[in-house]
Design a protein with these regions (language model features):
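Compositionally biased terminal segments of proteins
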Residues: 1-180
Length: 180
């Protein structure tokens, strides 16, 4: 991981924790925690921001902390934050694709060490479901799912995974990938 990403993750984690914003890293940056390691430049983050007022306050605090959100709108499920210091972009999801975004999801996220920072990452079960439930799911997403199933075998909460997969309408594809 480059020093720019390490710096960004450290400052982002401090900002979110300091402002008591529940969050979790999702997408490709979460994958090495549970599955295959592959290169990705996308930093996707889900933040628990439930009202327009919370959103407005978040944007103000983010800009004070060095993150710019030029096209921010609470009505959009995702927006881009740009870090002034590194120029790197963060996709901030208010309503992430493929994840039932609720208290149970937050309770199941895991704290993982990234470089010098402890950050929250989506649970392996919710990672799997989110990859399968994406409207633009591709072969790489299915490979990512398989790598997590193999690496985390014996530690995944199968009952929770299958319940969430059924709710998202992806239980059949999960079972097919699991058999491969």
């Amino acid at each position: 991981m480059s020093s720019h990403y390490e710096d960004l993750l450290a400052r982002l984690g401090e900002f979110l924790a300091g402002n008591k914003i529940d969050y979790m890293i999702i997408g490709g940056f979460a994958l090495p925690s549970y599955g295959a390691i592959r290169v990705t430049a996308d930093l996707d983050l889900a933040a628990w921001i439930q009202t327009p007022l919370q959103f407005k306050n978040f944007i103000l605090k983010a800009e004070i902390s060095g993150f710019k959100a030029p096209t921010a709108s609470f009505s959009n499920p995702v927006m881009v934050l740009t870090d002034h210091k590194t120029g790197l972009e963060i996709e901030l999801w208010l309503r992430p694709d493929g994840i039932v975004w609720d208290q149970e999801t937050l309770d199941r996220r895991r704290k993982i060490r990234f470089a010098s920072s402890d950050l929250y990452v989506v649970s392996p079960e919710d990672f799997i479901v989110s990859k399968l439930a994406r409207p633009d799911r591709g072969v790489q997403d299915e490979k990512d799912v398989k790598s997590v199933l193999v690496r985390m075998e014996g530690t995944i909460d199968r009952k929770y995974l299958e319940r969430r997969a059924a709710r998202a309408g992806v239980l059949a594809i999960l079972k097919a990938i699991d058999r491969i």
